[in-house]
């Protein structure tokens, strides 16, 4: 029997931009509880974004995350001994979580530059609808499209 659903944690807005989205990015980048370092990385990346685009960095940041958010994903569902990949719509909080996770993971996987620059580069690519994070979203959508025949197994 399943227990009740966990209450989502309330994330406070960040001190510089007053945005919850920035705090979530900082928390995702943070390692070993070193929040001040993570904040420097994120704020530095946002500054780089505003320099490169000539627009408000926080707006570019928000749009980049919006562009990466997936609409559908596949989840495994076991039916009669077979496991099907069933396409399901992604709930809003998970959309944001996945977008942030993909951007940070891709930025981390790049080599040879400081994290600020790697993160700014990936956010800029996402803003322009290019780059690995957008490809990841497209792959997830393709997988859901390929398994559309199993959509009637949704729960």
From Swiss-Prot:
Gene Ontology terms: biological process: translation
Which Gene3D superfamilies does the UniProt record give?
Ribosomal protein S7 domain
Q: Which residues form the signal peptide?
A: none
Stored Pfam families: Ribosomal_S7 (PF00177)
Alphabetical UniProt keywords: Ribonucleoprotein, Ribosomal protein, RNA-binding, rRNA-binding, tRNA-binding
Q: Which domain of life does the UniProt lineage start with?
A: Bacteria
GO CC term (a single one): small ribosomal subunit
Example GO molecular function term? tRNA binding
Q: How does it assemble?
A: Part of the 30S ribosomal subunit. Contacts proteins S9 and S11.
Q: Report the sequence similarity comment from the record.
A: Belongs to the universal ribosomal protein uS7 family.
Explain the purpose of this protein. Answer: One of the primary rRNA binding proteins, it binds directly to 16S rRNA where it nucleates assembly of the head domain of the 30S subunit. Is located at the subunit interface close to the decoding center, probably blocks exit of the E-site tRNA.
Family annotation (PANTHER family): RIBOSOMAL PROTEIN S7
According to UniProt, the name of this protein is: Small ribosomal subunit protein uS7
Gene behind this protein:
rpsG
